[in-house]
Amino acid sequence: MWIERNLIASILLFSTSAYAAFKPRIVKKEFDDLLNPIYFNDSSTVLGLVDQTLLISNDDGKSWTNLQEVITPGEIDPLTIVNIEFNPSASKAFVFTASKHYLTLDKGSTWKEFQIPLEKYGNRIAYDVEFNFVNEEHAIIRTRSCKRRFDCKDEYFYSLDDLQSVDKITISDEIVNCQFSQSSTSSDSRKNDAITCVTRKLDSNRHFLESNVLTTLNFFKDVTSLPASDPLTKMLIKDIRVVQNYIVLFVSSDRYNKYSPTLLFISKDGNTFKEASLPDSEGTSPSVHFLKSPNPNLIRAIRLGKKNSLDGGGFYSEVLQSDSTGLHFHVLLDHLEANLLSYYQIENLANLEGIWIANQIDTSSKFGSKSVITFDAGLTWSPVTVDEDEDKSLHIIAFAGENSLYESKFPVSTPGIALRIGLIGDSSDALDIGSYRTFLTRDAGLTWSQVFDNVSVCGFGNYGNIILCCSYDPLLRSEPLKFRYSLDQGLNWESIDLGFNGVAVGVLNNIDNSSPQFLVMTIATDGKSSKAQHFLYSVDFSDAYEKKICDVTKDELFEEWTGRIDPVTKLPICVNGHKEKFRRRKADAECFSGELFQDLTPIEEPCDCDPDIDYECSLGFEFDAESNRCEPNLSILSSHYCVGKNLKRKVKVDRKSKVAGTKCKKDVKLKDNSFTLDCSKTSEPDLSEQRIVSTTISFEGSPVQYIYLKQGTNTTLLDETVILRTSLRTVYVSHNGGTTFDRVSIEDDVSFIDIYTNHYFPDNVYLITDTDELYVSDNRAISFQKVDMPSRAGLELGVRALTFHKSDPNKFIWFGEKDCNSIFDRSCQTQAYITEDNGLSFKPLLENVRSCYFVGTTFDSKLYDFDPNLIFCEQRVPNQRFLKLVASKDYFYDDKEELYPKIIGIATTMSFVIVATINEDNRSLKAFITADGSTFAEQLFPADLDFGREVAYTVIDNWESKTPNFFFHLTTSEDKDLEFGALLKSNYNGTTYTLAANNVNRNDRGYVDYEIVLNLNGIALINTVINSKELESEQSLETAKKLKTQITYNDGSEWVYLKPPTIDSEKNKFSCVKDKLSLEKCSLNLKGATDRPDSRDSISSGSAVGLLFGVGNVGEYLNQDSSGLALYFSKDAGISWKEIAKGDYMWEFGDQGTILVIVEFKKKVDTLKYSLDEGETWFDYKFANEKTYVLDLATVPSDTSRKFIILANRGEEGDHETVVHTIDFSKVHQRQCLLNLQDSNAGDDFEYWSPKNPSAVDGCMLGHEESYLKRIASHSDCFIGNAPLSEKYKVIKNCACTRRDYECDYNFALANDGTCKLVEGESPLDYSEVCRRDPTSIEYFLPTGYRKVGLSTCEGGLELDNWNPVPCPGKTREFNRKYGTGATGYKIVVIVAVPLLVLLSATWFLYEKGIKRNGGFARFGVIRLGEDDDDDLQMIEENNTDKVVNVVVKGLIHAFRAVFVSYLFFRKRAAKMFGGSSFSHRHILPQDEDAQAFLASDLESESGELFRYASDDDDAREIDSVIEGGIDVEDDDEENINFDSR
């Protein structure tokens, strides 16, 4: 503070003759809007843009002229300026308007119109000009014409004469970018006029086909391109940049995902490109930008990553630098701060070589970052301090503009002098703008001093000797405006009061800061009105120092200032082999330094070569920190040196070599620099496992919960985010698939007790705490915001914490505690609150609830009318163990309706809500369904099911399937560990059900062994209890369930056992297969979803079509002894299986099935197995140096990543240390698979595969033949990535209907002979409801006992469901018109009699020739399931006539069977059908993703638990309830792992 007080005192007392006698001349100009001035270089001429009107001043802004009066005098229509371009030296300007374009080649003195032959695509047009650094007359013009956002067309042009004439570049219609190869001053290895362009070809659907790099040396008269064999032509080249001596291509690592990580390909000649090696990144952003480098052979780049924080802040980045080949990068500065707009917090201070100042993320700092500075081009970094006081750190807030990052033609103009805005120490508040200060340095950042106690905008004149500043409020709050200026490099200051309130927004000098003239842009307000005035001040210091010019020969007026000083040793620092000095005016000299518009030239002095700085690792060597030397990479060395004659020789190679381009002198003879490469021993096979990368991270505490975020709405953020919670209630986040984790840090010591994700908006993450605070992220856990909740979460009361709105991410319901001193307090209850602004405010919704649902977003608005604000709540009934269902359309403000007084819960499935109600006997259940929230229909179950009372329901929501029906499990056996029941299938609206399978297994929590095969409709697996009768007997208390696996290929219409493989993984034949036992005694039986540790582990994958895994055994039923289990694999959707390995394994799919990974479960292991060719061959890979106890194997939910994580404990299960192994296969494949979406015969890496029903004789399944695109298994050298394979899915044809396209209708049951027969004593449904549902219908069909499988698309053939049409009420006329009824007279003879005579004749002939001689009618049977062919019907065929007759007879027999069945089932009167509607709910530990269960037990039993309820899990929704005394609360230590996927 002493220094600061004395500085203020000096400002007040300082009075020299120069200050006393001098005041700058000020000219004030007012404009209608803010003026944006731009100087020509070395000139007093300024262009000014005001609201798209261009002005010009030739006297440093003192007077202005409308440029239109200069260019086009007399024209009425104003020129609307689109943009202005300057050449690199800022001596020429090019003005683009909406209609015409103008240029000046003499700094605005004269103007000339020029034309661009643009094919106008839209009304919004942008122009961008790039000039050749060597010859600025040569230019490339890029135009973009847009109709609307993202609907644009780019065109490229070139000019050889300063745009006076412009020609279009016509080498391709799809140019990505073109650049001069001499786009910087240091591009010395290419010809001056070389132009390099990138082109990209897309198909009609805008999918990538190919890229190319085109080069011309004579302005497109001759063009060279990459050969078709070059791998780059098959990669998505996103852009091109010329960086110093290099041409850099930005290449997407996945050609079908432009947001995938960016690869850099480098070339010096523009013809040969090599991929650069970048260090592994913690982030996945594709953004890469370049910095200026002191050596043109060294590339400096910034790579954007991600930041995890609670401040809502942005991203972090890394500063990278290459070696002098441009191919190998290392990190100079990590965790560089950046914001969401990629504005990097780094700058080249005062344009001095090697001096950079940056903000680096520092979580220990109150600001979240710290300012650091380097004086040796990034080799070392040190804190920025004030007045050389290390305890007074300076935190820079505002950095110079983006231009400081890139190549500039302008040299240093203010040597060592800079002003920045910042804060001192951690005591200041970064959010308080009033605490910001203005700081000055005169030694290029070595020391800083405060000059103003507020924010100021400043400009430099006369090379930094004159400084003009104005106070600036970032909030643009008006205050008395004054100028403050210094004539001695900021040591002393004077002020001028301008006499009005306002704010300055910018101070400008000419480009090289040599002029004494300044322009100040201000906004003024009078305090009485909101209207602002815009003033431009021209401030002239030409009369300062009594107009004296410094005598350059007088040393007392100048000093030699060294540009880079070591902050510790205070000695000059060498960068790029040289030191740098400037001759600058001393601060107290009273004269103008140098001549106007004269550039400063540094004085360079070469340094002696330094072995650590001026030498680098040679090609094929990498620096190793442990040995402190360059160690060889044998694969790189051998590929480069072991060629030709050297294949069997020993080659000597230098470990280090001199950095190309360094200016140092006196080469150093390096010790131990030679390495001998024995080429005869380096030829090793390039095995894939050598390219797998594994990392291991450990945390304190056991893993309790982990979640992979599903692909979100923001596609720029890749699907690699993992969130992990431990038993210590800490949360860690990884954005790179588990390679690195960051702990979610918060200010207070808060414990996280649960993690929720929004199923509808996967980017949203919610961290539940043990307090009344909630942490919310809407950007995939990149940052979190703290939200104060109205109460603590009610998780301990057995309720969920949150439910979400389907269409509004800001709307959710919070379930908290009310009046809870403890959970045993009798007054303790739950209270629901609703927010519509993402937690900023809450309103009470309803008290004493178990859960509430936004059901108004569930129903189908196209079919039904309902209130979108409709909410259903399950509300507790005092002193009762059941709930009641209440509804409201206004959040229970005025509207509240009780729908059902006694329920156990509700659930949603598809667009329905299902309610499980309790009957009057208090012992059984009844289910109702609604599709609009107001009309409910009872769900009718098959009448022939003997299940006694209904005790438990599970709704299986096939949300991954396209089936119009859903499955419903009704428990028929509820004894503990002996649970099973009937699997029922609904009709289209969920009101009636038929039996799909009996005795289907279920666990004690209501989850069912039913699992669909993802992405293949109609295929599902179940486990049935084959000893159900034995279990139902009273003598079976010690008997366990015997499970047998079955599979369906027609959505549950028929089920078959899994065919076992012949041999096991050890090539031994299975005994039951050897004995040729039937499938009933010898089939493959697999553990179901209820028996997996993580039910999110599906048997199949949505992206790896047809590939299935399962753990089980071959035999009569599933072996409960784990020692007899093995892992099985199918690549044809379950038709055939292969044993992979013996033991209990976990599995995962990667890259849409090209990578298969398995690891043994619940065992300490260090090795996994993987396959790259769909399971044909398997390899072992050791992923860790020590064995860990495996808990789970996981990857992204879409199974498209090439990264996997193994979650483990260091010791046995329950050990309090989490270990995460990450296994990365990204470098295993050498290329991306080729896919031509337009030409399937283009010879790419894919083939079509068609799923089949093994019971069918043709290729039809569900009424059609379909094909999916899959990578050819043997093409294991390529990966798929985000290739849109689903777009090539095709239906080859629809098939004729067969028996397998039908299932039994309601009240009909499958008989032993394969036919559907009416249940005794029941009546069929009344199908006339279709007339009421669809007013356009003119007919309906009487029930036949059959209904078509909902997923079947078959046409014609066997029509078992519509034999007898009946007209709809009031549609008789239309019905008669359709079927031609009502004819009389002659028409009857023609229409009826003649065909009847023909039929009788044909019938007699067929009877004699076909039926009678083949044994009569006794040989022909009825319709049976599974008898599509007639192979068992051998008929006499002696000639061609016999063959024709027999074919006709067989057809007639089939037809007669259909008629006979209709006769059987049309005798009963049709019953009426109930109307339609829906249901939703909840999760616990991740269970069957498709299950929602209603559980009930005897209300009068002493066990006291009617149903159980736990916290939410979006994958397994269970509808039940918590009765007093029936609550299970998770232990505080949370030892049990909860692989939740909310």
Curated annotation (Swiss-Prot):
Lumenal side: 21-1387, 1467-1542
InterPro entries, sorted: Sialidase_sf, Sortilin_C, Sortilin_N, VPS10, VPS10-sortilin, WD40/YVTN_repeat-like_dom_sf
BNR repeats: 56-65, 102-112, 373-383, 439-449, 484-494, 732-742, 1128-1138, 1170-1178
Signal peptide region: 1-20
Subcellular location: Golgi apparatus, trans-Golgi network membrane; Prevacuolar compartment membrane
Cytoplasmic topological domain: 1409-1445
Sorted UniProt keywords: Glycoprotein, Golgi apparatus, Membrane, Protein transport, Receptor, Repeat, Signal, Transmembrane, Transmembrane helix, Transport
GO cellular component, one term: cytosol
Keyword Lyase: no
Protein name, UniProt field: Vacuolar protein sorting/targeting protein 10
